[in-house]
Amino acid sequence: MAGVSEAERRGHRKLVRFQARRAIGPIRPTSAAWDRDFDPAGKRIAVVGTDAAAAHYISRLSESAASVTVFTQAPRRVVTGVPLWTTRAKRWLRRRTGAEHPAVAWATAAIDALTSSGIRTSDGVEHPVDAIIYGTGFAIADQVGDQTLVGAGGVTIRQAWDDGMEPYLGVAVHGFPNYFFITGPDTAAQARCVVECMKLMERTASRRIEVRRSSQQVFNERAQLKPAQPHRQTGGLEAFDLSSAATEDDQTYDGAATLTLAGARFRVRVRLTGHLDPIDGNYHWQGTVFDSLPETSLTHARAATLTIGGRSAPARITEQTPWGTHSVAGVGPPPYARSGPASATT
């Protein structure tokens, strides 16, 4: 039977702290905890942040409030070449967020402090305010509530996440079969993923489902490099192992290696993991090269050879991370020793 962690299904509401924070009329904590008795009519309202719900409540506030001032954050990422098909969506957002409404003002200067009469920004401007609405979104918890949760190998969730939470798709963790997390704030997508996993177990008459260590590692490494892609309801299930009992653990190596690239040899530290793919019958391995590599070598070739001890395997440098590390992958016998029944199938 599969279980879902109810305690971790939501992140906590993210509040910002300002200098000299003082009560200035009815301050509304967050847009996620809306007070239905709050009447914005005739009030001077400040909206701090523009979370995902901003397109809905800013437009409604501007209909009756005396004024609405939105204090926005600086862009965290600049994207060039926005697809043309988003033009209609952008127009809709501009209308709903009040970008084209005369009663809505936008303050781009950073907030310096809350005063007895309103908000003072870093440019010295005092903004009179009767109420504040925090649209600062969610801060996902960095640990689970039940630190005593024990997995199949006797490892607690606290030990498994010693360096921070790393669930696959935000719902599954290697070493904790039949157990799912729903952390939020997009609980609907996570719930659909869990339901698909349970349907897969039912179709295959399996009693156990567990995400592969390699899939979890690659997912979390890539999640740090680029914006997350939408999860397709029919996709992602190939990252799970199905069985009626405990399966062989993915093989993992963390240590020294020699990388041969463009005719040059480099002593590097790597962390590699892999699994035998039941569909194509090949062993797929991948991981991280933690040492920096010369740009001149990378411009000449991406194909490489990775050697660990007396074992060598063809590899490919797939991408470079912002931290100077490189992702490496290969198909076939890996450069590290494997144990268990799977080692005979290479």
UniProtKB/Swiss-Prot annotation:
Q: Which InterPro entries match?
A: DUF4873, FAD-bind_Monooxygenase_sf, FAD/NAD-bd_sf
Transmembrane segments annotated in the record for this chain: none
Name the SUPFAM superfamilies on file: FAD/NAD(P)-binding domain
Matching entries from PANTHER family are given as: FAD_NAD(P)-BINDING DOMAIN-CONTAINING PROTEIN-RELATED, L-ORNITHINE N(5)-MONOOXYGENASE-RELATED
Residue ranges of the region described as Disordered: 321-346
Q: Its GO CC terms?
A: plasma membrane
What is this protein called in UniProt? Uncharacterized protein Rv0943c
